[in-house]
Amino acid sequence: MIYQIINNRKKEILFFVLLLIIFYRSPYILLHGRFMAEEGSRYFANAYKYGFYYSFFFVDFSSGYLNLWANISGIIANIFTLKLAPLISNYLALVPKLLIFYFILYKDSYLIDKFQYKLLLCLLILLSPFNVPEIWLNSINSQIFFCILSFLVVFNKNEKKDINYLNLLIILIAGFTGVYTCILLPIFFFKYLKFKTLQDKYNLIILLFCAISQFIIIVFAKTTNLLYEGKLHIIDINLIYNYIYNVPVKAFLGRNLSQFIFYNLNINVQFAFFLICILSLLIAAYLIYYFKKNQNIFDRNKFIFNSLLYSFFSISLLILIGGVGDYVGGRYAALPSFYLITLALFLAIITNNLNLKIFLHLILFISILSGAYEFKNNNKYKKYLICIDCPNWSSEVEKFNKNSHYNIKIWPYPKKTMKLN
């Protein structure tokens, strides 16, 4: 009883600390609000101009998928006054992040059970370099955090006949908020085959329905030439170089540290690519050797291990062929980086080899430290986090109230505006 009270108190303190870190990164956004790009110019503008039904079922065919949470955020924000609308949208974007921390800390999971690793995973999600300013507190990129949340949901320990309706709602919203979560469908399928609980069955059915719906939207957008022409392209060597830098390198070293190493050692792209490939092959070979030697460890954990590998490679393939142009950094690199970091954490948990455990903990702490350094003021894109000569929202609303044809200035400024007439 006393142990349980102490354990709960630790979780409450950690949750509060995470909230403080979130507020530290962007106090201006959380106190004043801001619309980021299409969050305002498309999704909120739809709700403002066309009402509930149009906004709820709106599909941006140029992107090729339904983004339900962005639609819902625009609708709810429109219920409030125009001065409060961006603030409401920002707090709605915070919802999946808080749910992620709640599930990590308070839910029984096959993925992580000990408090110290729950703490480490929370810090990795919040502070590591993949949590770039581009995806911070805006509804259009909440799909990334809903995918992470869905991945946590699938590894919940479920009773045979109990149903958690919150989990079903999360899967439904996540599945209709972009295509990332739909990629996890095979994991939901094999989780059901493995445990055969009622919860896993309904999770699978809901995500299957979402995946089919999103697939139909993608096919329709592509066949009718509504899909942005830069999407669904072939993979070339320059894209691979870009991917290697933005995912495995930056996930652990961050932008500043990786560029410091490359520039000071005068390493060219081709040589860096060669070194990373060799290092990856050595790590893979060692893991194969280790698991063959410790078959019982692999057998106990192969479902989670294979799920992490599948998620990493499938999401990586998706961003490589579905990203815009020859760039897979920023928001595109977030999920592959998350799965790679989580794989490293999971291996650190299950291995009994001291040298491997030390190495994995070291690269995870480097990821946290490099991400913490870039978390706010040392970030190249800090204008996405803090107000630096940003438009005053109250003044923008007053200008719009005087002239309904005025284009309201939103973030990223000064190039983005929002039309509400």
Q: In which residue ranges do the predicted regions lie?
A:
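Transmembrane alpha-helices and membrane-interface helical segments
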Residues: 153-157, 184-192, 282-287, 337-353
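Perimembrane helix-loop-helix junctions
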Residues: 183-209
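Membrane-interface micro-motifs in multi-pass membrane enzymes
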Residues: 96, 103-107, 115-158, 176-177, ...
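Aromatic-anchored segments of alpha-helical transmembrane domains
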Residues: 123-130, 175-176, 209-219, 310-321, ...
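Acidic, Mg2+-coordinating catalytic modules of nucleic-acid enzymes
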Residues: 291-325
